[in-house]
């Protein structure tokens, strides 16, 4: 039937586009990590993505509060705020350490990194819920699997790097 065809078509289209996105992500990550002057920027954005995930988890566990969405029921507003705060601390400290300079643009960059990581996390949580996958592993206790750790990074790094280009 037409409905089944469309469902399969969009599933294959999504998989195809995701493979292209992941390939481009890996390609640009490789390019950035091989250029020494861009390596600091790349790793600062990566540390910001990791900080976003950790800050959200820790603040959410400590302060709890209202839930953000049903897509990912453990996400709270306190976790979202903690994610932004911790990302700001890590990114500004990292850039100050490497450049001995601080700019207000670092705060804007940090907020963009954190929000894009949170959106990426929610987006992939939505996809996993649709596919009826709860966790993608237990490598990080309380954090889900490796893919759960990568959810935010897959959106955070590209948005972080694009933001640096625009803000610079």
Question: What spans do the regions from the language model cover?
Answer:
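Juxtamembrane/interface motifs at transmembrane-helix termini
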Residues: 78-79, 91, 146-147, 161-162
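Hydrophobic cores of alpha-helical transmembrane segments in multi-pass inner/ER membrane proteins
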Residues: 23-26, 156-161
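Acidic (Asp/Glu-rich) catalytic motifs at the cytosolic membrane interface
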Residues: 49-65, 77-78, 115-155
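Membrane-embedded alpha-helical bundles of polytopic integral membrane proteins
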Residues: 1-76, 80-115
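Hydrophobic transmembrane alpha-helices of multi-pass small-molecule transporters
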Residues: 87-88, 156, 165
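Juxtamembrane boundary at the C-terminal end of a transmembrane helix
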Residues: 162-168
């Amino acid at each position: 039937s037409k409905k089944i065809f469309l469902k399969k078509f969009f599933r294959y289209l999504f998989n195809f586009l995701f493979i292209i996105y992941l390939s481009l992500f890996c390609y640009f990550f490789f390019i950035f990590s091989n250029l020494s002057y861009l390596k600091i920027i790349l790793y600062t954005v990566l540390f910001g993505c990791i900080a976003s995930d950790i800050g959200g988890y820790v603040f959410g566990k400590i302060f709890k509060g209202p839930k953000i969405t049903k897509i990912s029921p453990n996400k709270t507003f306190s976790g979202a705020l903690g994610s932004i705060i911790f990302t700001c601390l890590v990114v500004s400290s990292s850039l100050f350490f490497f450049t001995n300079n601080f700019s207000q643009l670092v705060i804007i960059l940090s907020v963009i990194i954190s929000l894009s990581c949170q959106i990426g996390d929610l987006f992939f949580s939505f996809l996993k819920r649709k596919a009826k996958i709860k966790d993608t592993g237990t490598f990080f206790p309380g954090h889900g699997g490796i893919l759960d750790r990568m959810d935010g990074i897959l959106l955070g790094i590209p948005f972080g790097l694009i933001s640096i280009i625009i803000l610079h």
